[in-house]
Amino acid sequence: MGNSESQYTFQGSKNHSNTVTGAKQKPCSLKIRSVHAKDEKSLHGWTHGSSGAGYKSRSLARSCLSHFKNHQPYATRLSGPTCKVSKGTTYSKHRANTPGNDFQGNSGAFLPENGFHYVDRESEESHITSNGHLLTCYGRKESLASTPPGEDHRSPRVLIKTLGKLDGCLRVEFHNGGNPHKGTSEDPSGPVRLLRYSPTLASETCPVRETRRHSAAGSPSSQRPSPTDSRLRSSKGSSLSSESSWYDSPWGNAGEVSEVEGSFLAPSTPDPSLPSSFPPSDTKKPFNQSSSLSSLRELYKDPNLGCRSPSGTCLSSNEYISSQVSLNNRVSFASDMDVPSRVDHRDPLHYSSFTLPCRKSKALTEDAAKKDTLKARMRRFSDWTGSLSRKKRKLQEPRSMEGSEYFDSHSDGLNAEGQVPAQTSSLLWSGGSAQTLPHRSESTHAISVDPLRQNIYENFMRELEMSRSNTEHVETSTETMESSSESVSSLEQLDLLFEKEQGVVRKAGWLFFKPLVTLQKERKLELVARRKWKQYWVTLKGCTLLFYETYGKNSTEQNSAPRCALFAEDSIVQSVPEHPKKEHVFCLSNSCGDVYLFQATSQTDLENWVTAIHSACASLFAKKHGKEDTVRLLKSQTRSLLQKIDMDSKMKKMAELQLSVVSDPKNRKAIENQIRQWEQNLEKFHMDLFRMRCYLASLQGGELPNPKSLLAATSRPSKLALGRLGVLSVSSFHALVCSRDDSTLRKRTLSLTQRGKSKKGIFSSLKGLDTLARKGREKRASITQMFDSSHSHGFLGTQLPQKSTNSNKAHDLHLYGSAVDSALRDSMWEVQTYVHFQDNEGVTVTIKPEHRVEDVLALVCKMRQLEPTHYGLQLRKVVDKSVEWCVPALYEYMQEQVYDEIEVFPLSVYDVQLTKTGDMTDFGFAVTVQVDEHQHLNRIFISDVLPDSLAYGGGLRKGNEITSLNGEPVSDLDIQQMEALFSEKSVGLTLVARPVTTRRTLCASWSDSDLFSRDQKSLPPSPNQSQLLEEFLDNFRKTATSDFSNVPEITTGLKRSQTEGTLDQVPHREKMEQTFLSADQIAELCRDLNNTHTNSMEAPTESHDPPPRPLARHLSDADRLRKVIQELVDTEKSYVKDLSCLFELYLEPLQNETFLTQDEMESLFGSLPEMLEFQKVFLETLEDAISASSDFSVLETPSQFRKLLFSLGGSFLYYADHFKLYSGFCANHIKVQRVLERAKTDKAFKAFLDARNPTKQHSSTLESYLIKPVQRVLKYPLLLKELVSLTDHESEEHYHLTEALKAMEKVASHINEMQKIYEDYGMVFDQLVAEQSGTEKEVTELSMGELLMHSTVSWLNPFLSLGKARKDIELTVFVFKRAVILVYKENCKLKKKLPSNSRPAHNSADLDPFKFRWLIPISALQVRLGNTAGTENNSTWELIHTKSEIEGRPETIFQLCCSDSENKTSIVKVIRSILRENFRRHIKCELPLEKTCKDRLVPLKNRVPVSAKLASSRSLKGLRTSSSSEWPSEPSKGNSLDSDECSLSSGTQSSGCPVAESRRDSKSTELEKDAQEGLAEFPDGLIKESDILSDEDEDFHHPLKQGSPTKDIEIQFQRLKISEESDVHPVGQQPLTESGEQPKLVRGHFCPIKRKANSTKRGRGTLLKAQTRHQSLDSHPETASIDLNLVLEREFSVQSLTSVVNEEGFYETQSHGKS
């Protein structure tokens, strides 16, 4: 029924007139329920100011059918009358058009919760209005005082009759329960009548949602049995809405006995007061409807009544709606349906106090037909209510005999057992306070105490009288008013939190609940100490779970907040089928780091909850992103996360590779920190990906993703943390990931709050974080401020505090998951700390929140009478049984530090004298200064030192502090004096060796005049001191401000405005300029101010992080571009210098030593010579690009950088494939580690390394040098990305740079691919090289940098040793520059089927997956086209090993078949190109490839054009239309691979690592010309068919063009004769011929412009013409060449024809002499 309840009082109570304030309720003999002491209110505290909250009485047994209550939790009645209920037959569906006043028979449901009002049948005109609702009462018109106590000790029976099937009419009759043969005391002749209520939409009294449905509309009214039918049964504490589904609850027509007080049998004689509408025949029909306790509870409730005499009784209507509270639809409305059931006959029962309709737990026979009908109609409501089935109850209810435990949310409950109350008192509630939880008694034989009985009708009248009298005492209780206003205020906060997302109720039902994991202090996950299952009515509104103690609330209880609320934002819900004791358990983890367990009623209900919560989270996620298409957004996020995972995985792998060769502890620590950060990033990305897939599954109806892939991504530290926690699951992992997020802390501060007069305790999880906001750089309120502003506390997933009206004491927060930190955490954060000194002494200091590290150091030193500048402070922390030391920066706050001990240590002080000699222009170090407002220096720090400079040799190191200059203390100098001293030829410094801070914590500045670079990170100063000086001076000229109040908060670097503001105050600019022009070192300061970014792990040039974006307030877009470009060039210079040092220090001396073998040398330095030469060329192109832009330093808009950006982007596009040289070096890095391990055991090797690095600097070690190429190649995409971000997205240069960025990212992918291949097959490659027969190995090493192509082919003629039954064995073909390797790797699935006698060609263990491996050196390799006899397959080809000795034959033929003809074409071309290359090399020098590579260390003399032939998209289009034969600058080269090796359209083949796709795109006629030039040098007899096959032959679909091999040879001999005449001088000294002939520049890669398809293949006549034209170009007069250069530069930004580089990156003239 409705929301009315009666407050039962004990008759004869000693305190029947008043209640002692604050007295605790004595517990009853049974654990009826737990009542909070703070729930007891004053008797006189009830006024209309309660905002309609009223007192809240709760049913003892929640056998409620009515789910129409909105919010209000109910308190149990401790005493009350006996009542008997007759059950009606059917429910009616609400209909807006139902007539208002007609009774349709006697089978309509006249429910008080539907808005029916109680009317005495004597006078319908006599009524009162309370809160605007009609209330008419009869027979009891006297006031509260006129009701004599104890007038009738018998509780009346309440008979409820359904008067109509469809229109919802009901009659309630009151009968005296003591004598069944006697009518009611007021009207023996008839029952009390109810006023007819019309459930229309226009009803002004009850705007309850229409969720009723016909349950048995077709049942005749004659099916109703008598209310005293013997089939009435008692219940053992069950509740339909909480225990069973609608369709499986066998409700009988028994009078239902209270769970708490027990049942008392009564005579079974028929009630004489039954009206004639109940015929005797009704007794044989089953019920279609039952009246639930909640329905009766509505009958006995008054929201405005506060006190009553114990002797009186009150009854209130359910429709007292406070005029101050609007309708609240927050809670889901479950349907009030029951199931018709047929029950066995048994003796009727007496009704005692607390007796209300309940059902017995006895299994009953049901009418199958009726039940099935209802099942079909009601099944859809079962999930909505979420009720537990009857048969699951015993299994699932935790510790059912201790009901008060699972629902008692406070510690002061009524928990005494076996006690009969010695005294009685009325429990009084204030608005919003009576939120204790319901409780079930497990016995039907509860004790009945006679004085507890009351007259329900008298209660009803008392409540009416009290409600009238309360209107006169509104102003009498200020405490009540205060409480009421606070309730309203809390309600407003509640509405703000929940209505802001316009959430709707998605799901509601009963759930058992307990917290599992919570986030404690120091962001630690801990298991919740107090873990008991509790049951709540849970509604999912929006993305928030609201927990109520009872269900089905309506608008009467709007201001009654939910018991708790849980934000489910970004949550993950997972089923927990492995729970040891319970079924249908699921786990919810939210973004706040909390984990909760829930138990649903069934598996279906569980799945519905999971889907509902995930769908709500997905909806909120889409709203946050402003998207309407949630599915599309989630898919987009999924793709983005996959890309991030891929990128971070690669970066982490490279960092691990770097870590393996670094031995310096500090650098290792930095790398490990970076790896740990990448691991955490990957975990977060994997978690977000899993979450997105969960949301997608909920929206699309799919299965949830498998958590195995997520848990596999857990890093080792995370596994250890979860192992300590004892819970390794998706939910705990999610909580761990969320606990690292700073936003988690902010989210935890948002919650449902209720106003309290004083501050509550803050969660212990927030200890130490309260004053976080006082750091100047973070502009967000502190936790304390947040609470102070709302005057309240409350947190996610926690029980809300309650406010007592008669007590001003602050109430403790009762928390799920963490104890209360009851100590008030105000802004005064002070800690007593003992500080140690190295002399085993120490002092105790008080550290305040505003103290920085330097403040504590100064305080400690002052106490010990020491000089603070000569001491440092370090922190000791114990982590996993190891001790970590950390030196924080002086400007960091002590409150932010995590430590176990503080130690002060002395700094080393030493003097250095630096003197410049010869043409030395500077000392080689940079400084940063701290100045005061008078331009006097406070401190000077060394910000950078060049490695080979005078300063470095003198012992200066980054981070040292200069305390005196030439004997003058720094504090006595100003800027001009400092500049003058640094400009002298000699300077004496007193230095304090201050350690570099070990972490980079962002912080606020020291002071307004602080110039110290926070991170102490800077780029090396540029060698061009004059440019720096000009920029430095410009800074002083442009900016003149000393107002620091407008300086924005800075997240990194230092405030440049401070520098400008202080330095600009120096007068006499002309004099200042003269001083600065003579101070070379001060120019370094500018670089340090502008460039504060370097790698914390290695040399300052190699950082994996993108350069920081300068502050918009200080740098324009042009300045940013200039800064990034300058950084690119500067770091490139430093990198080339490092590579040169590697050669000078290690490579060249090692060649003269004997402790490394040739193979080990190859491993260490395999492709480094080529890499160095290439990097020199690349550096020249970058420098030329900048030098060509003479106004680079004065460009003011990004558009003016257009030409320069095209040149830079073109350089990257042109050389993209050259960077693939790094793939071999990176893949071989595993070998490098093995070689360097020898230094630990080989004393000679170790002595050599020590001699190379006498100062023991890690940056000068061999490991450090060998890791620099790995770092550098990963740096390029980051710099390009920064350039791309600074250009206009619609501009051509933006597109151009984007293409360059893509090319470099492909390089990184290629390097990773090569590493993967080496990991899989490197062992095979090394083994094949080692197993070569013969005294001198033809192939000494196979470098991944020389891998040109790999492909999978079918082997058509496998060896017999592999088994005759094997068909189409899959071979992997690896084409290297020096050899071709065939490998058969057996599939693991096929191992079992392999015959026992099968062995690979090379005998190996059965466990070896490589069943066949074969190496064919390039000198013994032939390739043959053609189909196998009798087949039409044109994808077959043959590899021939000509010098094979197997099976007694001179050659071994491998018949292979590719997947398609295109793949065949690609691989055959690559093999032929290496054959031709080997042939030419043999002609020229007859040296093996590896020897020529080692000798080729001559630097390149010419370089690529600045623009790399890519000017703009317009010229790109123009070039695409031009014929390749008209391209003037494509001479062939003599020592590189042929062009059909398929270099990228924008790259070269120098790396030897082309990709198949580009192979098919890049076709040219220069292959034939190259082949002809090479063949001309050989006699006929030495020429093989496989060596002279042209591209026409390769294009096997067409017949041979005109000409023959003989004719080709004749042509070559003619050319050879001409070449001999010109080749008079040795290489490198050829003078110009009379015709001005230039040395030929060879080039193996092509212009990045793709030719048209019809211009790729030409006949031999065309080749001869092209050859003649090329020769004529070479012999052109110089003026003609200049004219052509001008045309090229104007049209294509090509500076000269001679600035083309061959494929290997070397300058070589064509040598045509005889070998």
UniProtKB/Swiss-Prot annotation:
The modification Phosphothreonine is found at residue 1662. Residues 911-997 form the PDZ domain. It holds the Pfam family RhoGEF. Changing residue 1672 to A: Slight decrease phosphorylation by Rho-kinase. No change in promoting neurite growth. Residues 1-27, 174-249, 263-294, 385-418, 1092-1113, 1515-1582 are annotated as: Disordered. One of its GO terms (molecular function) is guanyl-nucleotide exchange factor activity. Residues 235-245, 1522-1532 have a biased composition (Low complexity). Keywords: Cell projection, Coiled coil, Cytoplasm, Guanine-nucleotide releasing factor, Lipoprotein, Myristate, Phosphoprotein, Repeat. It comes from the Eukaryota. Its main location: cytoplasm. Residues 1120-1314 form the DH domain. Residues 831-902 form the RBD domain. GO terms for biological process: small GTPase-mediated signal transduction. A lipid is attached at residue 2 (N-myristoyl glycine). Residues 665-692 form a coiled coil. Residues 395-411, 1557-1572 have a biased composition (Basic and acidic residues). Residues 504-618, 1347-1478 form the PH domain. Expressed in fetal brain (at protein level). Expressed in the olfactory bulb, cortical plate of the cerebral cortex, caudate putamen, hippocampus, ependymal cells of the lateral surface of the lateral ventricles of the brain. Weakly expressed in heart, lung, liver, skeletal muscle, kidney and testis. Modulates the activity of RHO-like proteins and connects extracellular signals to cytoskeletal activities. Acts as a GDP-dissociation stimulator protein that stimulates the GDP-GTP exchange activity of RHO-like GTPases and activates them. Activates specifically RAC1, but not CDC42 and RHOA. Mediates extracellular laminin signals to activate Rac1, contributing to neurite growth. Involved in lamellipodial formation and advancement of the growth cone of embryonic hippocampal neurons. Promotes migration of neurons in the cerebral cortex. Belongs to the TIAM family. Interacts with MAP1A, MAP1B, PARP1 and YWHAE. Interacts with CD44, PARD3 and MAPK8IP2. PANTHER family: RHO GUANINE NUCLEOTIDE EXCHANGE FACTOR TIAM2 (PTHR46001:SF5), TIAM (MAMMALIAN TUMOR INVASION AND METASTASIS FACTOR) HOMOLOG (PTHR46001). The PH 1 domain and amino acids 619-780 (a region called TSS; otherwise known as CC-Ex) are necessary for membrane localization. PH 1 and TSS domains are necessary for Rac1 activity. The PH 2 domain is engaged in the enhancement of the catalytic activity of the adjacent DH domain. The PH 1, TSS and DH domains are necessary to induce neurite-like structure. This is Rho guanine nucleotide exchange factor TIAM2. It comes from Mus musculus (Mouse). The lineage of its organism: Eukaryota, Metazoa, Chordata, Craniata, Vertebrata.
